[in-house]
Regions:
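Compositionally biased terminal segments of proteins
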Residues: 1-232
Length: 232
């Protein structure tokens, strides 16, 4: 059976991935806060770090920062001394000064230059509005911003239940590990379970409601949980 490019990339272990695409050494949320201070764009920590707030930590090979696509210009202005690379289904292309963003681009990787590691990535939100966070895979799923984010220290994070919703599609070992480790309040757990049901993720809905785990889930692979992914 022929393996698709997407499957091949997502199947790489962390060492193989970084050997192919370059080394990662992610900044902390606090360092990113210093970097983006005063840029005028709202940015939010997403991904596995958002899913794990309040839970036992794991190693994270990267860090995801969500911004609205309308704010890319503000980001480019404050990061003019950095290199931004568009991600397109496994391919990386530099976003050069003065060149417009590719219309369907959803991710940007960030580093100083080719001799330096990748430091973080921007997830480009094309669906949320000034008033509401909107789930990109089904715009029926939406929440007021005050319900979608919370502040940890001085940094905004996507709430864990929203970060976990994004992870249900791929259900990789690290995604399952994040679900099983998550610390959700009662309303967040109920919202996530109901939304997973609505979107057809029955097993994740069951695990969210019950907190059950099989023996194989419990052995779940915290070791595999830190791998970087290029394709969502």
């Amino acid at each position: 059976m022929t393996t698709s490019f997407r499957e091949a990339v997502n199947g790489l272990d962390e060492a193989s991935f970084q050997a192919l695409y370059g080394r990662w050494d992610p900044l902390t949320p606090e360092q990113i806060s210093d970097l983006l201070a005063g840029c005028g764009a709202r940015w939010i920590v997403a991904g596995g770090r958002a899913a794990r707030v309040g839970a036992p930590p794991r190693d994270h090979a990267d860090i995801d920062i969500s911004i609205r696509v309308a704010d890319v210009g503000l980001i480019r202005a404050v990061m003019r001394d950095w290199h931004l690379w568009e991600v397109d289904d496994g391919a990386l292309k530099p976003l050069l000064p003065g060149v417009a963003l590719t219309p369907d681009c959803e991710e940007l990787w960030v580093r100083h230059d080719a001799g330096q590691p990748w430091r973080f990535e921007f997830l480009l939100d094309r669906y949320s509005t000034d008033d509401e966070w909107v789930y990109k895979r089904d715009p029926r799923v939406r929440l007021p911003w005050q319900r979608a984010v919370h502040t940890v220290g001085a940094v905004e994070y996507l709430r864990p239940e929203l970060a976990l919703l994004f992870k249900a599609k791929n259900d990789r070992p690290k995604d399952r590990a994040d679900l099983l480790a998550a610390r959700l309040d009662r309303s967040g757990r109920a919202w996530l379970a109901d939304t997973l049901d609505q979107l057809g993720h029955d097993e994740w809905a069951r695990l969210t409601r019950s907190g059950e785990t099989s023996e194989s889930d419990g052995a779940a692979t915290e070791a595999a949980a830190g791998a970087t992914e290029l394709i969502d």
